[in-house]
Structure formats: structure tokens, C-alpha cells
Regions:
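A generic short-segment signal for beta-strand/edge and adjacent turn/coil regions
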Residues: 44-50, 91-94, 115-119, 169-175, ...
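N-terminal type II signal-anchor transmembrane helix
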Residues: 27-73
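Bacterial extracytoplasmic/cell-wall-associated proteins, especially those involved in peptidoglycan
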Residues: 165, 169, 182-373
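Hydrophobic core
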Residues: 51-55, 89, 252
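Solvent-exposed, charged interface segments at domain starts and junctions
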Residues: 19-34, 38, 105-118, 219-222, ...
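Short, conserved glycine- and acidic-residue-centered signature motifs
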Residues: 55, 82, 319
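N-terminal targeting leaders characterized by basic, low-complexity, disordered sequences
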Residues: 1-22
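Signal peptide-directed extracytoplasmic domains
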Residues: 61-227
Length: 373
């Protein structure tokens, strides 16, 4: 008889686990040396293709970016001040569409060693020049002259855009337009009035490093010289007109018609209306007012410039004008017309005058079939 006590939890003894078979390295699939070389070669080849493509794309972009922006031959004035950096010069050139890329300009000047050789001065450049040509010009330091044309019939806002296109900065334009000028031409101008109408249209030759303020002073000189030499001042005074009043009326004549003969007859109409105490009734005045106000151009517009509603002359000129408009106010045509209308359609470019309102309405019906309806 077995008197040994039974083994406790014998039923719960763990069943021994099978031994773990080690995985031998030699049992794993191994690439052959030739296959490994082939994979590495393909990887390197792919990387080379990517790098070559990127390099080619960069080279193509750079070649394009340092090229001429366009075929335009317009002249643009650029002034480089002492102390200006290549980065700042690139900003100015790009602002005036003279280079395609500021980055490419900076890279070019770095690669060519010209970055610190750009000279201060006034330059006349064109959009049809490439970066190489521009940089060579600026390294030479030769100051240019520019023929700058101020067109007639432009408002001050339009002249601002024209001067910017010529290469003057916004800051320089603001300074020139807001400066105080001591000139006899401006003596009768009301206090606080701007330069609307007083920038004389002409072509001026100037050094590219001259300021816009200096150019405006030359335009005032030219304007006043014309008034004196042509005896316009004397005629204005005979009619009881100050320079400011005469220039204001001439600007309206300029915007109404451009034909010198018609300008003289239009001036006769306006002068007679003023003498008779009638409103000028000029559409171009309320159109100007609407543009300044950002409003719809209607005859009922509430503005001191609207001569459809306000008697007498508006507060000031509405544009600059040709010498022919100044002459028209000084020496108007004879006659006693009170009305005129510009023709359209087959009568485009012609102006029709009338003494009575009935005649005027008949002219409108016969000659202004589209614009007047």
C-alpha cells in the first residue's frame, strides 16, 4: 500500500512547450552580389535623372529670367542713389517691369562679381534689355538723358500714372505734386488747390537723375513763357479773367473738343454764357467730378464742378491743355452761339453750333443719334 501523499496540483502541471527552432541566417534568401549591384545602380541612376532634370529646369528658368521682359522700346528712367543695394535696385527694376525676376538679378550680380560695382546715377532703360545689358550699363555709371513727354488732356491722376510709367517712384510723385512752388503762373491759384491743369504738355529733355519737382518747375516756366510771348495774359486780363480762371476755362475747352478751329468757337460759346449769366452746361465737368468722387456720371451730380447745376466756372481746371485751347480762350471765334453738340456716326469729329435752344435740339436730332440718346 502506497502511503505517500499525492502530489498537489498534479493535474495543473504545464505541458512542456516544444523547443524554439532558431532561424539560421543561412536559411534566409540572400541577394546575389550581382543583383545587389544592379539595384544600387538603378537607384543611383534614378537619383541622377532627378538631379539632372532639376538642374536642367533651373538652368532653363535662369536663362529665361535674366532675359529681356518684352520687346517694348519705351524708355524708363531709373535713379540709383548712393548707398542703394543690389537688392533694392532689383526691387525698383522689377517694379517697373524692367526685369523678370528679382532673384535672378541678384544671382546674376553675385555670379558675375558685379553686385558691389553698381554705380549711383540716373539711367534710361528699356524692357527690351536683358539683365546683362542693364548691369553693364549700371557698372559704367554713365548718366543718361531722357526725352520725357507730358501729353495734353490728362488729369492729375492720369499724369501720376504716366510719370510712374516713366520711372518716377510713387513717393517722388507724391512729393512733387504736394510741394509748394513760388511761381507767377500759380499766383492766382486758390489756397489749397492742387496742380490740376498746370503741368504743361510738352516734351522735355532732362538728365535721368533730375527730380520730378525740377521737371514740374520747368513745365511752369514753359507754360508762363507761352502765356507771355503769345500775349494770352493781356487778352485774359481784358476779359476780366485771372490766369486760374483762364486755365480752368481752357481745360474745359480742351476736354470738349480737340480741333483748334472748333476750340475757338466753343470758347466763344462759353464766354458768351458767362457774360450772359448762364450756366456753362458742360458735360465734361460733371464727368470729371464723377471720376474724382467715384460716382456715376449724371447731369444731376452734386458737385461744385458740375456746371450743369452750378453757375460760373468750376473751382479749378479739369485737365492740362494744348496751347490751342489757351489761345481759344484768349482769341475766341466771332459769333453769338450759345449751344454746341458733337456729332456721332457719319458726323463723328464734327461740332455743330446753334444760337437758340430749338436749333440746338434740331442739331441733336440730326447729328447726335447715339451719344445723345
Amino acid at each position: 500500500m502506497d502511503i505517500r501523499p499525492p502530489r498537489p496540483n498534479a493535474a495543473r502541471e504545464k505541458t512542456p512547450e516544444p523547443p524554439i527552432k532558431p532561424v539560421l541566417l543561412e536559411n534566409m534568401p540572400v541577394l546575389s552580389t550581382s543583383k545587389r549591384r544592379k539595384t544600387l545602380t538603378l537607384t543611383l541612376a534614378g537619383l541622377a535623372v532627378v538631379l539632372l532634370g532639376a538642374t536642367t529646369s533651373t538652368a532653363l528658368w535662369y536663362s529665361w529670367a535674366i532675359g529681356a521682359p518684352s520687346d517694348e522700346e519705351r524708355q524708363v528712367r531709373v535713379v540709383v542713389e548712393p548707398g542703394d543695394t543690389a537688392t533694392g535696385i532689383a526691387e525698383t527694376l522689377h517694379e517697373h517691369d524692367l526685369i523678370r525676376s528679382k532673384l535672378a538679378f541678384n544671382v546674376y550680380t553675385q555670379l558675375t562679381g558685379t553686385r558691389s560695382k553698381l554705380q549711383a546715377g540716373g539711367y534710361v532703360l528699356s524692357p527690351n534689355q536683358d539683365v546683362s545689358s542693364i548691369v553693364d550699363h549700371m557698372v559704367s555709371g554713365e548718366t543718361d538723358e531722357i526725352d520725357l513727354t507730358i501729353p495734353p488732356g490728362l488729369t492729375l491722376d492720369e499724369l501720376r500714372k504716366s510719370f510712374f510709367a516713366d520711372g518716377f517712384s510713387e513717393a517722388e510723385i507724391d512729393q512733387a505734386f504736394s510741394a509748394s512752388y513760388d511761381h507767377p503762373l500759380l499766383a492766382s491759384r486758390p489756397a489749397g488747390a492742387d496742380l490740376e491743369g498746370y503741368i504743361y504738355p510738352e516734351t522735355y529733355r532732362m538728365n535721368a537723375n533730375q527730380t520730378l519737382g525740377e521737371l514740374l518747375e520747368r513745365s511752369f516756366d514753359e507754360f508762363y513763357r507761352v502765356l507771355e510771348e503769345k500775349k494770352y495774359l493781356e487778352e485774359y486780363q481784358k476779359r476780366g479773367l485771372s490766369i486760374h480762371q483762364a486755365v480752368t476755362l481752357a481745360s474745359i475747352v480742351q476736354k470738349e473738343v480737340t480741333n483748334p478751329t472748333d476750340q475757338k468757337q466753343v470758347a466763344q460759346v462759353f464766354l458768351k454764357r458767362l457774360n450772359d449769366g448762364m450756366m456753362l452746361g458742360s458735360d465734361v465737368t460733371f464727368i470729371y467730378a464723377a471720376e474724382q468722387m467715384g460716382a456715376e456720371a449724371t447731369p444731376g451730380l452734386d458737385s461744385p464742378y458740375n456746371t450743369r447745376k452750378v453757375s460760373g466756372l468750376p473751382p479749378g481746371p479739369i485737365a492740362n491743355m494744348n496751347p490751342s485751347a489757351l489761345e481759344a480762350v484768349a482769341f475766341p471765334a466771332g459769333g453769338d452761339y450759345l449751344y454746341f453738340v458733337a456729332g456721332d456716326g457719319p458726323d463723328a469729329g464734327k461740332t455743330f453750333f446753334a444760337r437758340t435752344e430749338a436749333e440746338h435740339e434740331a442739331n441733336i436730332t440730326a447729328h447726335c443719334r447715339t451719344l445723345c440718346n
